[in-house]
Amino acid sequence: RVLFRSQREKGRGAKTNWKNSMEDIFYATVGDTYTFNLDAVKQRKKVLAPYRENGQPKDWQESKDGKFRLTCPSNFWDDIAVPYWSMPENTAHPTQKPEKLIAKLILASSNANDLVLDPFAGSGTTGVVAKKLGRQYINIEQNPLYCAWGEKRLKDANKNKTIQGYEKGVF
């Protein structure tokens, strides 16, 4: 189970309980052998206590931006922005998921040229991200408007392969 901090608060007017700003992602596998590409989803984190061994950084690197290490991700994801109106990936779909969220799932659980299936495609985010990451994809959606949005986004993905928050293979 992965918890995604959606930043899209639900129950804004709730007076009898906590507002929900989390979404659950259930990650399931079948059998003992499955794909999990840990190195593909490591995160770049700022080092608070930079240890050295023989004068050299122990498990971190220094750059002009500071001291960072690549770390294994946890099952709580709070580094993902919901698509805002000004972001190129944004559509008017009420539950659109961010490309970065889907990218983490696809990179962790598939390899290049693998097939990714989304039986409830909505605005097509899964197919768009699969295409940008070199995967094959099948999107299924019954709403004609959402299908049109998805088709446009897939065409746009030919021109723009960037995923907000994912740069040079690092989140």
Predicted feature locations:
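Core catalytic lobe of class I
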Residues: 1-149
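S-adenosyl-L-methionine
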Residues: 151-171
